[in-house]
Amino acid sequence: MINESIKNFIESLAKYHAENVFNPWADTNPDYEIENAVILRRRQLETYLSRRLSTAKLLLIAEACGYQGGHFTGIAMTCERMILGYHKTVTPMMILGKEGTRTSRKDSLFIKKEIQREKGFNEPTDTVAWSACLEAGLGPDEFILWNIFPFHPYKKGCFLSNRTPTDEELSVGLDYTRQLLEITGTLPI
């Protein structure tokens, strides 16, 4: 069962909107994504957090959601190939306890690489983060991956790009991180 505080947290995330920022839990782009992408990403984040709520020992925080990772999965530092079972190290069972659902469109003319259309997006940072936690001896449900700016900042006019969050965006992100810590309780960061 999904914790009500997690649902409320995701609703809070969904309220954020800014220029040149994609919100995985509120926004969708039909050129790149399937129709019900927002609903799927919300469910995946709910499942991810609920599995870790009572077991997490660590909160690992990176900078921002990237276009090859959390943008399409709704989960920080977690790419589509991981939730679909195409990753060599991280399996869907480790993340969600079941196979996840991709939200990028296999038939998108805007996704240029055949491998991305076939197997979904793959983010190198995601592999590094997951591998580091697992190699440190943490079980997959003993850490929560998060971004200080949980949304995907992109360069103007270039949807599939990443940019560094502004100071204002980082400040907004800190508020969301505090909300997350209210749900999880105190965790080493």
Show where each model-derived region lies.
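A polyanion-binding, active-site-adjacent surface
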Residues: 2-188
